[in-house]
Curated annotation (Swiss-Prot):
Organism for this UniProt entry: Rattus norvegicus (Rat)
Chain positions with Asymmetric dimethylarginine modification: 1565, 1578
GO cellular component: axon; dendritic spine; glutamatergic synapse; postsynaptic density; postsynaptic density, intracellular component
InterPro entries xrefs: Ankyrin_rpt (IPR002110), Ankyrin_rpt-contain_sf (IPR036770), Dendritic_Spine_Reg/Scaffold (IPR050889), P-loop_NTPase (IPR027417), TPR-like_helical_dom_sf (IPR011990), TPR_rpt (IPR019734)
Glycosylated residues, chain numbering: 1930
Source organism, top-level taxon: Eukaryota
Subcellular location as annotated: Cell projection, Dendritic spine
An individual GO BP term: regulation of dendritic spine development
Gene: Tanc2
A GO MF label: structural constituent of postsynaptic density
PROSITE patterns: ANK_REP_REGION (PS50297), ANK_REPEAT (PS50088), TPR (PS50005), TPR_REGION (PS50293)
Family: Belongs to the TANC family.
Protein name as annotated: Protein TANC2
Length: 1992
């Protein structure tokens, strides 16, 4: 009856609310919960917050009925004395006050229950300190809670906030449905299931403890508030404030965007209390604009607004949402935007000096001590304002105009931020010290401020700010926002567990660990790593004394926390703290320097500061001046008197001065008398005066007194709405109207300042204290009654519609206890007041159990509130969310909170209730070492022998942790009952286990105690047995201690007689236990006690094997030193080395091998250490063993080798190591590699490498075998992720095979392989290119052209492709011409030019195609070497096969020259094919390397200017202009040196070029030209002289225009050589007159071409092909004829690009000069520079010395064309004959240079370069040149290739070939005696000359050189190219010849040969050439390419 009536009274008829039954865990049955949740949810707004009843106060804020506990309250409380009496009592006390619930409340005003939750939470968390039960009871009020500091949530935000809360931020997690934070966690999980947010939050919580799913389903409010509320006390969302904006915000922010643990926690203190710990939403809210509505208000609306903000926070850059730490919102009402800071520089100076001092006892921090109002907070705020956090000052300083009476000129900007200096605001005289001193002091202040990284204000009226968890969390949040510590922020973002560690939940559970591991250790590490500045940092803490007001029953205050932690602070992290003088004792443990602000008499600076402030106030206000001046005058005397009087009264208090001046300024004080009697004498009188003025009558004060009472009693700032609701909660009749309330609040606005979050704080802590307490003798007027405020707040919480969250529940309990409204009733009613209070709280909320078990109340319990909760029906056996869902008693036992344990036991908590791990409270207490709690529990008959799930009893737990006293107590306990009950576990077993546990952990005292136990009643069971193993771990004491390395315990045990050989249960003896762990000191101890160093275990393993297996090097070395045998084997035949290898311990392997271990020992399975190491997979061990003689091909009994094992185990690093060491890939290897794509790739790559190696060595057949084998082994399937890699690998293999097949003349297969590659990789331009080469080799020019067009589409910038394309186009034309009767040589040249130029690879192309090209380059070399020109004699001569090294860049130039589009204007590369072609070509060394065939081709073909000289050289192919069209410019390959001579000299450049041997073109053509252009006597070119060939060619038969070989009209042909000087030209001296004549026209032409080429020096060399006499007196024609072949070739070969492209210097050929200007037979000819102009001649002569010249001289004209090209200035040798095969490279080095220049491209550029020389040579070899010459001219392989472009001026390869044979002979025979002398086109020397270096004359040498040239020049293509056309008559020999020609490129290429090439030789050559050309290609020689394919 009583309960019901009371309930009806309180609830206003609503009896739905029930308290949780005290029994079992849940406060209400799950179904009911569910239903209520559902019902609430149904009406909750978004976020699950109920819009109706959720609101703390709905429009009607009737107080919800107090729920009755389900289990009858009577049971717990006992039957009430009399229902009626109790009911009457409550009615009397409460009834009148409560009356009916007030139903109407202004929507905005509704006060949420959340506030209550927060308060409650705080209360729970904190013990009620004597000063304030509130404090202790409430950790932090939720924002919405009446006490909450958080701004109320706006209506829209409400819903969201709530949901946010529901979602539970990490903090909120704390508050779960279950009471308390722990409950929060639990609920949190449930909610998590329901909300994604929750999910995130759960993670964090999870880390802390198990979260129970929130039972938020009960009601929307439940869900919302609950989760929120309960989860976070701080959230107190349930109270209107927090939930609405904060929770929502926090949740939304934290939950949605970040993981739970990252979710921002409401930074409210309450957060940890029963409200959600993680919901610091209120803090967030504070950050946001304050919302007026209470959290409880309709959530949806509130949440809406809040949500948007939250979203902003979440997604906006604001702060990366991932940082979940949220700073507390601090507002300091006493600091306003108008506050002025004056003076006190001395304080900063002293602080700075102390912090920088070297005295470690005081440099860690400073304590600023002063009385209230003395400026401590202002000093801290000043530093904050000037610090990196200065922007947050707006949050600290209050904007409120009422903040202080003085708001006259409120400058919006914080003065603190401006940091006015004392002297700035005061008359200069008033400031202490000189300006310099002041400046230094101000600098000190700014320096200190710059070091501030965090700050914290403790405010007694905002409990959250006084709690340690919030302090830690706030400091961490500010640290990570400090710009100096960005590295710390990044680390928090990188390591989410650190954020979790700093979550409010973690801070509540263990603030010290959180601070140490989340702040101090990371900062220390960052400092060591120099990631943060190496300077001091400062943390500011204001008002340590304020925090004492909220001191918890258990746990630290901020001061005690700092005292314990300061020892862990790094020396560079300083603290500046402030404390009130009266409480300075609390800081005595801090080793800080102290600065006193109130010792006015001792410190003159304080007086000066006060004086400055007074002066500032007087001067800054005319009102003050008027009020204090006597007779309207303000004289110094008056001022001094007033100043002195005020300073005396203030005693140093700035607050007193400020308030007094405010009164004077406003006219409330008028100082007209000199006695100043009206001035208040103390701060108390100032407040009294202010109140008297504000409230003149008692009734006026009575109207506002309830508001002040509520504000004083609240734990945190409340919004106006909350205060309004709280006041109305106490009215029975007629509620206060909102307008009336607002009016009253306005009257208080100067005392209760509105913060940004719309909550109200007292203007100053001193005013709050003045309202509560007065000193003796002071007037008691205006004293407030905090009890009344507590009562109103308690009623307000009771009337909340929704269920209170944990924080609010604890706040409610706090207020109920503080209100104490039943005081004195117990006697009257017969019911104890505590029972009545329990009934009250049980009727007011359902979450008692959850509040009791909230995190904050678990870790910082409020004993009184907890008792109240238990009285109200909280379940004392409620399972928490921590310690494996341990019951509350377990947690309190673990924490050592004796009072709480006693309280729980008093109310009958289950003493043996266990957590999920099976531990009981006794186990927790024993493990933690709390003897008092162990005793308490044992008195309650806790089971001593209870075993947890690990089989450990409390005694073992105590022994494991070294708690001797607990061990002693437990052993003395009575185990009999327990033993009888269980019948299994006996005390003796426990003691034995305890012995092992203590021994393993090294607790010698416990071991000794247990061993010395008395033998009770003669029963040995009591005493532990030293040699027995226990029943738990199976260890003996000695094996346990030895295994854990406990040396002292081992000594003790051995002294006590422990057996050294006594094994444990597994049979392991102590020696093995310790060896396994590597404790060599204990090994030593055991050995000294008789252990055998070589003893073996059951498997035959010795300690040495064990140590080696485990990798303990120190132990291994120690055992070896102690005589351990290194050769012993275990039962498997494994030695110590085998074990070390099997486990991959390199250091041990090294040690054992050094000590003589056998590396070839085989075990019983035949496995050597290397096998085992390969099995393990440590490549370093494998490498070491192989280096030390291990057999790499050893086969074990199963047929496996180390490589096979490594493959089988997929140890790729070992596979690679073994393959590098030469391991063979056998069938087993392939078998093991099956389905291991990574291994297959390695093996196939190895095969490909081997193939590449053979290929480069010229062993094409072997290379092809390797590639074929690799393809055969290619896996059919199972590529998986490696599909792309395998495809690329296969494409490479196919392309390589294609190359090899082409080299092997198997063009069909080559084409087929390239096609397969295309099928695999349709977009592969390399494949198109390879197939085109194959088709070209088989003379399918049209098809090759198609492929090349495709390739050029795919890779438009690849010069190799471009060059080959041009050549193939030229060849196509030539083909057409060939089909017709051999046209005059001129025609082919036309075609040639196109072919000639191969596009020069661009770097990018090079890399992609490089392999191909390089290989081709190599191929060409190989081919050059391998394939001899079929021409019989020629090969040998041409063979001065110096295989011209691939054309060096010089060659390229030549190529360029020839390739110049002018084609017709072919600059003559005067490179002697012969020895000049040698590497030196040197002398000439046009940058282009010796031209490889490729180069030659390019020479013929104009090559892009960018092409290297070699390429230019390559452009040599010129198609001779039609016979009739001499005047026309045709790109024609430079005629072979012989042919060229005449052409060049006589014919216009283009035409002369056209002279190239047309296919039919034969020497005749040259002769013709020669005749035409012969000049009477051509002076010998210096080249010829230099060539050391005195051979002046006797007049060659001048006109032997044989066959179609037409010499161009004797127009001077301009030979453009890239070489700056016309050395080349000069070397072939052409009579100036003749040349001059022709030169001009040519020059003009060439110049234009040159311009195109961009060759700076390119010189037009006139080759006076018009009959002239060479210096020797031969008719110029002859010379021309000889020269024409080369020169023309060269000339034609020059491209614009070629000429200009490379300065001679550019070509690698620095060597150009180095080589003696030997003019190989061909060389001289080719170089026979036709200097058309005197300049050219001069240059050439001068350049002879110069590299350019030397090229000219050395190289046969034909050979050198490439070389010459590089040097535009150098004229090309007139002789074209040899040139045909060769490219002239300007530099003798050209070959080498080419290689150097484009090693990567070797294939491309080098080949091209080489090609020029080679090409002519090839052409010759193929067409008509002697085999030798082709060789010289082209890459060895080139000769085989028939050139479409006139080679050496002969287009028809046949002609060339024919020429070659003759030339071959002749070339050697004829030498250009003078520079004029032209080498016969065929002379091998000339041909080879293009190569930069002169290979040995022998064919082999030639081959070598060719190879080199090819490699360097990369242009072998032309040889190949030409050979098909008219391979040398000899056929394959032609190739050789070309090669030889290239080889000849050495200058060495037997000068003799060249010399022999006398005129007669030349004549013969010409004749032969003409014949050959007429004949056409005699033998189809497949054009061979230089090794480098790039040279087409």
């Amino acid at each position: 009856m009583f309960r019901n009536s009371l309930k009806m009274l309180l609830t206003g008829g609503k009896s739905s609310r029930k308290n949780r039954s005290s029994d079992g865990g849940s406060e209400e049955p799950p179904d009911r919960r569910q239903s209520s949740v559902d019902s609430r949810q149904s009406r909750s707004g978004p976020g699950g917050i109920s819009t109706e009843s959720d609101c703390a106060f709905e429009p009607d804020y009737a107080v919800p009925a107090l729920p009755v506990s389900e289990g009858d309250v009577e049971q717990e409380l006992g039957p009430p004395p009399s229902v009626d009496e109790a009911a009457n009592t409550l009615m009397t006390r409460l009834g009148f006050l409560l009356g009916e619930k007030v139903t109407e409340v202004q929507p905005g005003d509704q006060y949420s229950m959340e506030v209550q939750d927060e308060n409650q939470t705080s209360a729970i968390t904190q013990r009620i300190s004597p000063c304030s039960t509130l404090t202790s009871s409430t950790a932090s009020p939720p924002a919405s809670s009446p006490c909450s500091t958080l701004p109320p949530v706006s209506t829209n935000a409400t819903a969201k906030d709530c949901s946010y809360g529901a979602v539970t931020s990490p903090t909120s997690t704390l508050e779960s449905r279950d009471s308390g934070i722990i409950a929060t966690l639990t609920n949190y999980s449930e909610n998590m299931e329901r909300t994604k947010y929750v999910g995130e939050a759960g993670k964090e919580l999870g880390s802390g403890g198990n979260l129970k799913p929130w039972q938020s389903q009960k009601s929307s409010m439940d869900s919302c508030l609950y989760r929120v509320d309960e989860n976070m006390a701080a959230s107190t969302y349930s109270l209107n404030k927090i939930p609405e904006r904060n929770l929502e915000t926090v949740l939304s922010q934290s939950v949605q965007s970040i993981p739970l643990y990252l979710m921002p926690r409401p930074n409210s203190v309450a957060a940890t209390s029963s409200a959600h710990l993680e919901d610091l939403a209120y803090l967030d809210e504070q950050r946001h604009t304050p919302l007026r509505t209470s959290l409880r208000m309709p959530r949806q609306s509130m949440s809406g607004a809040r949500t948007q903000q939250d979203l902003r926070v979440r997604f906006a850059p604001y702060r990366p949402p991932d940082i979940s730490l949220k700073p507390l919102l601090f507002e300091v009402p006493s600091i306003t935007t108008e506050s002025v800071f004056v003076g006190r520089d001395w304080v900063f100076h002293e602080i700075d000096a102390q912090l920088q001092s070297s005295n470690a006892s005081v440099n860690q921090g400073v304590v600023i001590v002063g009385n209230i109002g003395f400026g401590k907070t202002a000093i801290i705020s000043r530093l904050v304002a000037l610090s990196c956090h200065g922007t947050r000052m707006r949050q600290i300083a209050s904007d409120s105009p009422h903040a202080s009476p003085k708001h006259v000129d409120a400058n919006r900007e914080l003065p603190l931020t401006q940091a006015p200096s004392a002297h700035s605001s005061i008359a200069s005289g008033s400031c202490p010290g000189t300006p310099e001193m002041r400046r230094r002091q101000e600098e000190a202040m700014r320096r200190l401020a710059s070091q501030v990284v965090a700050y914290h204000y403790c405010q007694a009226d905002n409990a959250y700010t006084c709690l340690v968890p919030e302090f830690v969390h706030n400091v961490a949040a500010l640290l990570c926002r400090s710009p100096q510590l960005t590295a710390y922020r990044e680390q928090l973002l990188r390591e989410p567990h650190l954020q979790s560690m700093l979550s409010l939940r973690s801070c509540v559970q263990d603030p010290m660990a959180s601070f140490r591991r989340g702040v101090l250790e990371p900062l220390e590490n960052l400092h060591k790593e120099r990631k943060i500045p190496d300077e001091d940092f400062i943390i500011l803490i204001d008002g340590l004394n304020e925090a004492e007001f909220h001191k918890p029953d258990y746990g630290d205050t901020i001061v005690s926390f700092l005292s314990k932690m300061i020892g862990n602070f790094p020396s560079w992290l300083k603290l500046i703290v402030t404390v009130r003088t009266s409480l300075q004792e609390i800081t005595k443990l801090l080793p800080f320097h102290r600065i006193f602000l109130d010792r006015l008499e001792e410190n003159e600076a304080i007086d000066q500061d006060l004086q400055a402030y007074i002066l500032h106030r007087i001067h800054s206000s005319s009102e003050i001046q008027n009020n204090i001046s006597l007779n309207g005058k303000m004289d110094n005397t008056t001022f001094g008197k007033l100043s002195s009087h005020l300073k005396t009264l203030s005693q140093g208090s700035y607050l007193y001065l400020k308030l007094t001046f405010d009164l004077i300024e406003k006219g409330y004080l008028v100082l007209k008398s000199s006695s100043y009697k009206v001035v208040p004498v103390s701060l108390s009188e100032v407040y009294l005066l202010q109140c008297n003025m504000k409230f003149p009558t008692q009734s006026s004060f009575d109207r506002v007194m309830p508001l002040l009472n509520v504000a004083v009693a609240s734990l945190h700032p409340l919004t106006d709405e909350h205060i309004f609701q709280a006041i109305n909660a106490g009215s029975i009749e007629g509620t206060l109207e909102w307008e009336d309330f607002q009016q009253r609040m306005e009257n208080l606005s100067m005392f209760l300042i509105k913060r940004r979050d719309m909550t109200r704080m007292f203007v100053h802590p001193s005013f709050r204290e003045w309202l509560i307490w007065r000193e003796e003798g002071e007037k008691t007027k205006f004293l407030c009654d905090p009890r009344s405020g507590h009562t109103l707040l308690a009623f307000w919480f009771s009337r909340q519609e929704g269920k209170l969250n944990r924080q609010q529940t604890i706040e409610l309990g706090h207020h109920i206890l503080k209100a104490h409204i039943f005081k004195g009733l117990s006697k009257k009613v017969g019911v104890s007041s505590s029972i009545l209070q329990g009934l009250w709280i049980s009727y007011s909320t359902e979450g008692l159990s959850m509040a009791l078990a909230s995190l904050r109340n678990l870790y910082t319990p409020n004993i009184k509130v907890s008792r109240l909760l238990i009285l109200g029906g909280a379940n004392i056996n409620y399972r928490t969310e921590v310690l494996n869902n341990a019951p509350i008693l377990c947690v309190q036992s673990h924490l050592g909170y004796t009072e709480m344990v006693a309280l729980l036991l008093e109310f009958g908590a289950n003493v043996d209730a266990s957590s999920e791990s099976g531990l009981t409270p006794l186990g927790y207490a024993a493990a933690a070492g709390f003897l008092s709690i162990v005793v308490l529990l044992c008195k309650k008959r806790a089971k001593v022998d209870h075993l947890d799930k690990n089989g450990q009893c409390a005694l073992v737990h105590a022994a494991l942790r070294g708690h001797l006293e607990v061990v002693k107590f437990l052993i003395q306990c009575d185990w009999t009952m327990a033993g009888q009950q269980q019948g299994v576990f006996k005390k003796s077993q426990a003691i034995q286990q305890a012995l092992i546990a203590a021994a393993s952990m090294g607790y010698t005292e416990i071991v000794s105690y247990l061993l010395d136990l008395p033998e009770k009643d003669e029963e040995e069971v009591e005493r532990a047995q030293i040699n027995s193993f226990d029943s738990l771990w199976g260890e003996t004491a000695l094996t346990a201690a030895a295994g854990r390395g406990k040396l002292d315990v081992c000594r003790l045990l051995l002294e006590q007689g422990a057996a050294v050989a006594q094994p444990n249960r597994r049979g392991a003896v102590p020696l093995f236990s310790t060896v396994r762990q590597g404790h060599w000191q204990i090994v030593d101890l055991l050995l000294t006690h008789g252990a055998d160093v070589n003893m073996a275990d059951k498997q035959g393993r010795t300690p040495l094997m064990m140590a080696a297996s485990e990798g303990h090097l120190g132990t291994v070395d120690f055992l070896l030193a102690q005589g351990a045998s290194i050769a012993l084997m275990d039962k498997e035949g494994l030695t110590a080395l085998s074990w070390a290898c099997l486990k991959g311990h390199l250091s041990v392997v090294r040690s054992l091998v050094d000590n003589g271990a056998a590396t070839d020992h085989a075990d019983k399975n035949g496995r050597t250490p290397l096998d085992l190491a390969a099995f393990y997979g440590d490549a370093e061990v494998v490498q070491f063993l192989v280096d030390h003689g291990a057999m790499i091909e050893h086969v074990d009994y199963s047929g496996m080798r180390p490589l096979d094992r490594a493959v089988g185990c997929r140890n790729t690093s070992v596979v690679v190591t073994l393959l590098k060491k030469g391991a063979k890939i056998g069938p087993a290897t392939w078998a093991m590699a099956t389905s291991k794509p990574d291994i297959m790739i390695i093996l196939l790559s190895k095969l490909m490498e081997e193939g590449d190696m053979f290929y480069k060595k010229g062993k094409v057949k072997e290379a092809a075998q390797r590639y074929q084998y690799a393809l055969k082994k290619f896996p059919r399937e199972g590529f998986g992720e490696d599909l792309k890699t395998f495809r690329e690998l296969k494409v490479s293999l196919l392309l390589n095979l294609s190359r090899c097949r082409r080299k092997m003349n198997d063009f069909g297969m080559a084409e087929e392989f390239a096609t397969k590659a295309l099928e695999l990789k349709p977009k592969s331009y390399e494949a198109y290119y390879a197939r085109a080469r194959a088709k070209r080799s088989s003379r399918q020019f049209a098809a090759a052209l198609e492929d090349l067009k495709e390739a050029i589409k795919l890779c438009p910038n690849n010069r190799e492709i471009q060059r080959l394309l041009m050549r193939v186009e030229e060849e196509c034309r030539q083909m057409q011409q060939q089909q017709q009767p051999p046209p005059p040589p001129q025609q082919p040249p036309e075609e040639l030019p196109e072919e000639e130029t191969e596009p020069e690879p661009q770097p990018e192309d090079i890399y992609s195609v490089q392999d191909i090209f390089e290989e081709e380059y190599l191929e060409q070399d190989v081919e050059n070497v391998s394939i001899g020109l079929q021409t019989e004699a020629r090969p040998s001569q041409g063979l001065p096969v110096i295989q011209s090294p691939p054309s060096s860049p010089a060659h390229r130039d030549s190529a360029y020259i020839s390739s110049s589009p002018l084609g017709s204007h072919q600059v003559f590369d005067f490179r002697s094919n012969s020895s000049v072609g040698s590497p030196t070509r040197q002398g000439y060394q046009s940058t282009s390397p010796a031209l490889s065939p490729t180069h030659q081709n390019s020479h013929y073909r104009p090559s892009p200017p960018h092409t290297s000289p070699a390429h230019q050289g390559a452009s040599y192919r010129f198609s001779p202009p039609p016979v009739g069209g001499q005047g026309k410019e045709y790109p024609s390959p430079p005629p072979s040196p012989l042919r060229r001579g005449p052409q060049y000299r006589a014919s216009p450049p283009a035409e002369s070029m056209s002279i190239y041997r047309s296919q039919s073109g034969s020497p005749v053509r040259y002769q013709q030209e020669a005749n035409v252009s012969q000049l009477p006597g051509r002076p010998k070119s210096p080249l010829s002289k230099m060539a050391q060939r005195p051979y002046q060619m006797p007049q060659l038969p001048v006109a032997v225009p044989q066959q179609g070989l037409r010499l161009q009209p004797a127009k001077a042909q301009i030979v453009r050589s890239n070489q700056p000087s016309s050395a080349v030209h000069s070397s072939t001296v052409i009579p100036t007159g003749a040349y001059g004549q022709v030169a001009h026209p040519m020059a003009s032409k060439y110049q234009s071409s040159q311009g195109d080429m961009g060759v700076s020096q390119s010189r037009l060399v006139y080759q006076g092909s018009i009959g002239g006499i060479v210096g020797d007196g031969r008719p110029v024609q002859h010379v021309q004829a000889s020269l024409s072949a080369g020169a023309i070739c060269q000339h034609g070969g020059l491209t614009k690009e070629d000429l200009p492209q490379r300065p001679s210097s550019a070509y690698r050929g620095g060597m150009r000069y180095s080589q003696t200007p030997q003019i190989g037979r061909s060389q001289s000819a080719s170089y026979y520079p036709v200097c058309h102009s005197k300049l050219d001649l001069e240059r050439s002569s001068s350049q002879l010395g110069s590299p350019d010249v030397s090229h000219l001289i050395r190289r046969p004209i034909s050979v050198n064309p490439n070389e010459i090209k590089p040097h535009p200035p150098t004229p090309r040798p007139l002789l074209h004959s040899q040139s045909v095969g060769l490219r002239f490279s300007p530099s003798s080095n050209s070959i080498s240079s080419t290689a150097n220049l484009t090693p990567t491209f070797r294939p491309s550029s080098s080949i091209q370069q080489m090609e020029i020389p080679l090409k002519p040579a090839y052409d010759r070899s193929c067409d008509e040149l002697s085999p030798v010459s082709p060789t010289q001219g082209g890459y060895p392989s080139e000769p085989t290739r028939s050139r479409t472009t006139p080679f050496m001026g002969i287009i028809d390869k046949t002609a060339r070939t024919q020429q070659y044979p003759h030339l071959h002979q002749q070339n050697r025979t004829w030498a250009v005696s003078s520079v004029d002398t032209v080498l016969s086109p065929t002379s091998p020397g000339n041909l080879s000359q293009p190569e930069s270096f002169s290979p040995p004359s022998s064919i082999s040498n030639i081959a070598f050189y060719n190879k080199t040239n090819n490699a360097q020049n990369g242009h072998l293509l032309e040889d190949d190219y030409y050979s098909p056309h008219g391979m040398l008559a000899n056929g394959s020999r032609g190739d050789l010849l070309e090669r030889v020609s290239q080889a000849s490129s050495y200058p060495d290429v037997k000068v003799a040969r060249t010399l022999p090439v006398a005129q007669a030789y030349q004549d013969n050559l010409y004749r032969q050439l003409s014949r050959d050309s007429r004949q056409g290609q005699t033998s189809p020689i497949k054009p061979k390419r230089p090794f480098v394919e790039s040279n087409v």
